[in-house]
Every structure is written in structure tokens, then in C-alpha cells.
Amino acid sequence: MRFTKMHGLGNDYIYFDLVSYPISSVDWRELAVRLSNRHTGIGGDGIVLIMPSEACDFRMRIFNADGSEAEMCGNASRCIGKYVYERGLTRKTIIALETGAGVKRLHLQVNNGVVETVCVEMGKAIVNEGLRMKDIRLNSSDSESAAWRPHLLETSETKVISPSSFILPPLSVVDMGNPHAVVMVDGEITDEMVWQSGPRIEKDPRFPHGTNVEFVRVENRQELRMRVWERGSGETMACGTGACASAVASYAKGLTDNEVTVHLLGGDLHISIDEHWQVRMTGGATIVFDGEVEVPLVADPR
């Protein structure tokens, strides 16, 4: 089966084009675990399926390196925009993409047939009062009102009994179609912070489906620095939805402007937030190589 390795700022996935090469009898969860292994597989943060859609131009499914399915990935969305245009699946420069978090519109900046950047309409950010991903709207009964402002959850030093004794740092819970816990850091974002705090917050029982965890330092009103522990994949070079969540949390706190550049390990993303808390993300995407891999067929695909 043919695949294409791509990355968005180092957030790398193995992409399968099921529009050009349709196949259904595959255990995608098992395949994601096997192929994502960087020693015995192709290596990546997971696999992404580019699929036909009845309602949109294309559909995206994402499986993390541990086999779990994710609702949305901003970096993968940009990569799909580049792939479908440069491989001739569409001539559109505005693409409707069906995801597990709803329809996302991709705006392609094309120069001489090459997609240089992709701007993704990420949708409306929700900053929650509690850890149950409940949509809380303040000062307005109309969810689209410009008067609505997200409410931030600020945990005090809360003792977490399970899975181990750990002091949960102050965080903000943001829904970008997938869950995010944003930790604002005053000083250096350390390896210990990411690799010890990240998995513990990810698996905290108050996040029943787990969460992505962002560690964020405000550089100035137009810049953030971020490292991310992704649910199901561990630390990655970049996370598009995480960059959006970080920008929303810092803007809602009054720490930054509504347009920021987020510096990640793999590069920079530009995030903008409008008066209705609709978020846009702009960045590049890279095709690394194409290949073929043997894929076992199963009677009961997942």
C-alpha cells in the first residue's frame, strides 16, 4: 500500500491516500502502532487517512502512535491541504475538510503550483470552567455574541491521588475540537516539566478521555513559546491545535494580543483570534518522501 510521509513543523505522520487508492479492510489502530515505531516501523506521531467525503471535499481520520483516534490535528490539516493540491486531487485553493471536530476550511497560498502555506479556520475556541469539557458562556445567552468571553479555569495547587501523587500546576482548559490543558510557565520550559508533568496531566482522571498538555511562556504580547505533550503520542515537535489553545488562553488572560506567533520546537505558527473567538492558524507543510508498505487485511476493520 502506498503512503506519503509528511510533517508540519516536525509533527510527522504517515499519510494514506484513500481517495486515489481506496481500501477498507485494514485495522488502522494496529497499523498506527506498528508503523509509528521509529525503530521498527516507518516512524511518526501516527497515521492520517485522506478519504472521500459526502459532505465536504475531503475527510480526515487520525490515529495516534498508541492507536487511539484523535478528533483533530491542525498540522495534519495543513499537510492534507498541500497533498491534495500538489498531487492533483483538487484545483481548489479553499478546501472543506471533514474532521472528527467538524468541518474545517483550508485556505491555500499557492505559488507556481506549490502550496507554500495553509491557513486553517480552526473554529470557535471554548475555555471551560470545569474539567468536564462543558461549554460555559458568560455575559451572553447568544453563543455567537461578541460580548461572550471565555471563562478560565484556574486550579490552585490541587492534589491528584491517581495515577500517582502529584501537584497539578495552574492550568486553563481549552476545547479546540479536542481537549487541551494549558500550563502558563514563568521561567524556562524544562524537559522535566514536560516529560513528568505532561503524562500525569494527560491521564488525570478528571480528563476521562485524556488531554493534550501545553507548557507556554509569554515572550511578549505578540509571541509565545510552547512545548507540547500530545495525548497518545507524547512530546512532539509541534501541535497546531495546541498552539491555538495556548494563544486563546493567553489572550483571554490579557497577556497577549489577538494575533501571535507561537514558537514551537519545529518552527513557528501564526495564530489569530477574532471578536467572536473564532481562531485561524497559518503555517507550512512538507512532503518528506513516498513509499510502499505491506498492510495486512482483516475481516473486521477498525
Question: Positions of the model-derived regions?
Answer:
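A glycine-rich beta-to-alpha transition motif near the start of alpha/beta enzyme domains, typified by
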Residues: 1-117, 162, 182-302
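Membrane helix-loop-helix hairpins that form the core translocation module of multi-pass transporters
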Residues: 117-125
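Short, flexible, solvent-exposed loop/turn segments with mixed acidic/basic and small polar residues
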Residues: 3-5, 170-174
